[in-house]
């Protein structure tokens, strides 16, 4: 049995392919049961978000597990496996554990450091549990991953890294509008500390009088479509960039109102998009809609009222919110996630990202030690149960041969036999648990099973006199 993850994400697949991979919450139980009914997958969890689809599994065999999961992903995407294979990644054991820990910390997200993935991983795990397909192996893995994710966000300022993609998008948008394009970094308070500036240094007041650069979005009107985590971050970013007016359109008015209150914005309904696009300079969209939110015809109808002013769309959604065809319209620019991915290729890795990577590495090592020790525990229990049975049998035989011993004498004999057996077992059982943490540690447990002809199933019931032998290790 081993851990395995097979999937594709924004780093391995184009946006056009990722748009076809989403699995609804209603369909996940069927996907899980289809996997479990195969011969190679014993446990499974499906993680499906805007930027990835991954199947984590405990598998009987590596190659069989990869084949079963890859076939399932092919069916989900509606793409021939031969065409899909080039976009898939496969991680096994330590690399699978490290991948999940990195994902839950936001290190593998398009928006690095974003915390929404923590809730998405929790939801995926609960769906696996509800379907009865996430057993003890994946339960231990996902519970550990969620703890690591919480530590990353509470003990570091990894959230600050998440602001980078929005800041880069706004910088590109300001450039598209012909404006100064240096966007101030969004300050993020470190755990127990002051707000950090863009370089990770506690911000202080200026020491010398300087002539400030004009805000990159000074005097502009910004329309935000979507009020989720990315939309809220976008509102904060454009406000710091000096936007003159911020308008928020969202399907849920109450959520939009909360974001608007925090960032001095105005709320409109989605039915008002045509008018608001006519008035806006920059439109940033980040909804979770399954189809287009802003279509070509809607934008074309808004252009006559703009008097030739440039209009920039920043599409942070996946699947796309903005019709790619708007690029063909005069005076209209579109910046999408693919463009942002290129712009971010050379971005400097922040100190907090490195801190989280170190945290992940340490937690992976700790989890592997626990996992290996857990694998050898049944062998230790079986060995001590076997020894206890032998002691019990031999003491019974000895008792019939020495019927004249009184209780005190018999107690001394019984104690001596048990101590001898316990001392003989102590070194091998302790050593095999130590060796279990090393690569190939399972082989030592298997050797004990073969040498002592131990059963594969751990005894469920042990009599009270044998408890000492079973519990010592």
From Swiss-Prot:
Reactions it catalyzes: (S)-4-amino-5-oxopentanoate + tRNA(Glu) + NADP(+) = L-glutamyl-tRNA(Glu) + NADPH + H(+)
Recorded E.C. number(s)?
A: 1.2.1.70
Let me see what the UniProt entry remarks about domains.
Answer: Possesses an unusual extended V-shaped dimeric structure with each monomer consisting of three distinct domains arranged along a curved 'spinal' alpha-helix. The N-terminal catalytic domain specifically recognizes the glutamate moiety of the substrate. The second domain is the NADPH-binding domain, and the third C-terminal domain is responsible for dimerization.
Question: What residues correspond to the site Important for activity?
Answer: 99
- Which parts of this chain are annotated as the region Disordered? 196-215
Sum up the protein's function in the record's words. Catalyzes the NADPH-dependent reduction of glutamyl-tRNA(Glu) to glutamate 1-semialdehyde (GSA).
NCBIfam families for this protein: PRK00045.1-3 (NF000744)
Q: Does the keyword Transmembrane helix apply?
A: no
Name this polypeptide is given: Glutamyl-tRNA reductase
Question: What does the sequence similarity comment in the record state about its family?
Answer: Belongs to the glutamyl-tRNA reductase family.
The record's active-site residues are: 50 (nucleophile)
What top-tier enzyme class does this entry carry? oxidoreductase
**Which SUPFAM superfamilies did the record assign?**
Glutamyl tRNA-reductase catalytic, N-terminal domain, Glutamyl tRNA-reductase dimerization domain, NAD(P)-binding Rossmann-fold domains
General remark: During catalysis, the active site Cys acts as a nucleophile attacking the alpha-carbonyl group of tRNA-bound glutamate with the formation of a thioester intermediate between enzyme and glutamate, and the concomitant release of tRNA(Glu). The thioester intermediate is finally reduced by direct hydride transfer from NADPH, to form the product GSA.
The biological pathway it contributes to is: Porphyrin-containing compound metabolism; protoporphyrin-IX biosynthesis; 5-aminolevulinate from L-glutamyl-tRNA(Glu): step 1/2
Q: Which UniProt keywords apply?
A: NADP, Oxidoreductase, Porphyrin biosynthesis
| Binding, substrate | 49-52, 109, 114-116, 120
The record's Gene Ontology biological-process terms are: protoporphyrinogen IX biosynthetic process from glutamate
UniProt-listed PROSITE patterns = GLUTR
Q: Where does NADP(+) bind?
A: 226-231
What is said about its interaction partners and assembly?
Answer: Homodimer.
Span-the-membrane segments of this chain are none
Q: Its Gene Ontology molecular function terms?
A: glutamyl-tRNA reductase activity; NADP binding
